[in-house]
Amino acid sequence: MDKPGLSYKEAGVDIDAANRSVEMIKKWVGQTIRPEVLSGIGSFGGFFALDLQKYQEPVLVSGTDGVGTKLRIAQMMGVHDSVGIDLVAMCVNDILAHGAEPLFFLDYIAIGKLDPVLVELLVKGVSQGCLQAGCSLIGGETAEMPGFYREKEYDLAGFAVGAVERSRLINGSSIADGDLLIALPSSGLHSNGYSLARKVLLEKAGIKLEENIAELGHSLGEELLCPTRIYVPAILALLEACEVKGLAHITGGGIVENLQRIMPSGLGAVIDSQAIEIKPVFKLIEKLGQVDKSEMFRTFNMGIGYIIVVSPLYHDKALKCLRDKGEKPILIGRVEKDREKVSIQ
């Protein structure tokens, strides 16, 4: 008698588990839906009807990103419900830097063995991030990839689309000598520099993730999994209140490289390092890893998550607007001509 042939499930891909996960995430996705969304989960594509009455000449702004090796910390700790917030933050904060209001988001989850409970936790985090950003989670993909990832390993990618009036598109071109730099604090490492952080703190120093660290006031794992801040509400309010010349999301490359990306030719900036409240986790990495200060500023955000460039005329108004939104803005520097680079002093 012939033996029965192999099934897809025996090969490592469980379609029934995938269907269960879809049912489990529907409640989280549903919480994010804006009126412009025309489709539900299960379609081949997500439908979003742009409200053209809000714009004279709309420009769509898109961005994609991941969470990087911060996911390794989440997987080591078995904590999966916050990295989805990181995923949304990394994408929406980028498109926000051009003045765009985030409209919708899509996620991609690649996993070794599909666990519906784990997928639900990941999507729960994504939905929480979307709620913070005011955008809809309108689609996604979960790929079970046995033999490519270990059973409990996964990776995340996200895609955000927003819109801005063409005349209000921000690209840094109007930045001028003497403009001021206002910074918004980060919550910690956000989602960058984790390869160096793990090398120093886990491998070199031998600290356990569950170990409480006096300098931090909690465990190392809690610090490393603190979600990336989403700056959308504060920045959108600021854009309505005053003229903003440039916005920089401080991610990989730190303050120097990300701020330089928006500077016109012939202009640079001077950052006052004394104005920056460097968070304890960065001091810990610098000390235990004997990492040079310049390398720290080139790798990590050092406590600054977003930088806003405004004319001195709007300085006071910008600070008030940001404080009214619950932010703690600080003046950290100014734009200067004939520098061609950003320097930290």
Curated annotation (Swiss-Prot):
One of its GO terms (molecular function) is phosphoribosylformylglycinamidine cyclo-ligase activity. One of its GO terms (biological process) is 'de novo' IMP biosynthetic process. It comes from the Bacteria. The keyword Cytoplasm applies. Pfam families: AIRS, AIRS_C. Pathway: Purine metabolism; IMP biosynthesis via de novo pathway; 5-amino-1-(5-phospho-D-ribosyl)imidazole from N(2)-formyl-N(1)-(5-phospho-D-ribosyl)glycinamide: step 2/2. One of its GO terms (cellular component) is cytosol. SUPFAM superfamilies: PurM C-terminal domain-like (SSF56042), PurM N-terminal domain-like (SSF55326). The keyword Transcription does not apply. It catalyses: 2-formamido-N(1)-(5-O-phospho-beta-D-ribosyl)acetamidine + ATP = 5-amino-1-(5-phospho-beta-D-ribosyl)imidazole + ADP + phosphate + H(+). InterPro entries: PurM-like_C_dom (IPR010918), PurM-like_C_sf (IPR036676), PurM-like_N (IPR016188), PurM-like_N_sf (IPR036921), PurM_cligase (IPR004733). Its main location: cytoplasm. Keywords: ATP-binding, Cytoplasm, Ligase, Nucleotide-binding, Purine biosynthesis. It is an enzyme of class 6 (ligase). It is found in: Cytoplasm. CDD domains: PurM. Its EC number is 6.3.3.1. PANTHER family: TRIFUNCTIONAL PURINE BIOSYNTHETIC PROTEIN ADENOSINE-3 (PTHR10520:SF12), TRIFUNCTIONAL PURINE BIOSYNTHETIC PROTEIN ADENOSINE-3-RELATED (PTHR10520). Belongs to the AIR synthase family. This is Phosphoribosylformylglycinamidine cyclo-ligase. It comes from Syntrophomonas wolfei subsp. wolfei (strain DSM 2245B / Goettingen). The gene is purM.
